[in-house]
Amino acid sequence: MDRDRLGAACWLLATPLFLAANVVVGLAWRQPPFSWATHNISDLGNVTCGVWDSTRPRPVCSPWHDAMNGAMAATAALLALGVLLTWPALGRGLAATGARLLTLAAAAGYALAAAAPADVDENRHFLAALLIFVLGNLGMLVAALVGRSPVLGGMRGASLVLGSTGVAGVLLFLGQVDVGVGVGGMERVAVFPLLLWTVLVGARVVRAGRARRLS
C-alpha cells in the first residue's frame, strides 16, 4: 500500500471509530441514560459522576469513559496521519497548505480532549474544543478555495457546504440555541462535518491514485 492510500485509509477509519465509540459508550450509561440531544460528546469522557456544567447543568455518569477517551486519542492519531501521509496528494498552494494545517490542529484538539477530560481540566478541554470547532471547520472553508488539485479541487462545493454547516453548528451550540435537536445535537452539527469531510477526501485520494495507476 502506497503512502497516499495508507493516509486515505487512516481518514476512512477515523470517522467510523469515533462514531462507534459515541454509540457504544453512550449505551453503557444507566443513571442517567445518555441523550444525544441533551449531553455533550465530552460527557462520554468524563471520569466522575454527578451534575456537570454550571451553564447547562445535566447529570453525567459514563462507566466506559476510558474507552471514549481512548477512542478520541485514536481518532486524533488517525486524523493526523491522514493529513501527513496524504500531504502531497492534496495539492499545492496557500489554500491547500492552510487546509492541511487547520485539519492537523483539529486532530490535536481530539488528542488534547482525550488527555484532559472536561471534569479533569476544564480549561484545557475547552481549548481542545476550540481547536476542533473553530479550526476544523475553518479548514474546510479554506479547502473550498483550493483550485488545482485532483482531490480538493474536485470537492470545493462539499467543502463549502460542510464547513458552513459546521460553523453554523458552532455558533448555535455556543449560543445554546435549540433548533429541535437539543443543544447536544447542535454540538454534533458542529463536530461531525469535519469527520464526514475526511471520509470524502479519503475516498477521493483513493480514486485519484487508482486513476493515476490506470493512466
Model features per residue range: what roles?
Residues R3-P32:
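N-terminal signal-anchor transmembrane alpha helix
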Residues P33-W64:
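Extracytosolic (periplasmic/ER-lumenal) interhelical loops and adjacent juxtamembrane/interface segments
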Residues W52-P88:
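Individual transmembrane alpha-helix segments
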Residues L78-A107:
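Cytoplasmic juxtamembrane regions at transmembrane-helix boundaries
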Residues T97-A114, S164-V170:
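Small-polar-interrupted transmembrane alpha-helices in polytopic inner-membrane proteins
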Residues T103-A143:
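Membrane-proximal helix-loop-helix units in multi-pass membrane proteins
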Residues V142-S215:
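Terminal transmembrane helical module of multi-pass membrane proteins
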